[in-house]
Amino acid sequence: QLIAKTLQPSSGSIEVHGRVAALLELGAGFNIDFTGRENVFLSGAILGLSQKEMVSRFDEVTAFADIGDFIDQPVKTYSSGMMMRLAFAVNTCVDPDILIVDEALSVGDAPFQSKCFRRLRQLIDQGVSLLFVSHDLGTVRSICSRALWLKDGKTEMWGEAKDVARAYEKYCWQEQGVTLET
């Protein structure tokens, strides 16, 4: 939330360079009374894109979201999966420099999740910085090169994603009283 500037730091300052697109929570940034179409343009405007730029990206957004005629229905009528589809499509089609995905892919069906992971990989390959927040260690291992484990708001470990995931798993098992051989 600090990087996305939806929350102010209690002390110090944060400097962010580039366009930040953030999937922080389901429906964040959407006006539920607006249609999906209206929300696409609203989201683009919030991210600093002109209406002309959003018109040129609209077909890509709707094709990726794959919600059909629901694009012209109020977002409040959407299922959580439909809302996530549209939010993900908008945020990944606006050429972000930094993309924040905070547990947002936990909704939606498996084929769409797979489509999202392919899109994330494409964005990473294009040089987009991805800040991916998840408790799904398999996904962290497959998408992230580096990982940060926070415990009580403080850095517990920072390093290669596979090493951090392994240490976190070991910690979780030990918390449950299970000892693992290393």
What function would you assign to each model-found segment?
Residues 10-20, 155:
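ABC nucleotide-binding domain "signature motif"
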Residues 21, 41, 53-70, 87-89:
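Conserved ABC ATPase "signature" region
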Residues 142-149:
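Conserved catalytic segment of ABC-fold P-loop ATPases
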Residues 152-153, 168:
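Conserved ABC ATPase "signature" C-loop
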Residues 92-101:
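A short, proline-enriched helix->beta-strand linker immediately N-terminal to the Walker B motif
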Residues 136-142:
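Conserved H-loop
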Residues 158-159:
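ABC ATPase "signature
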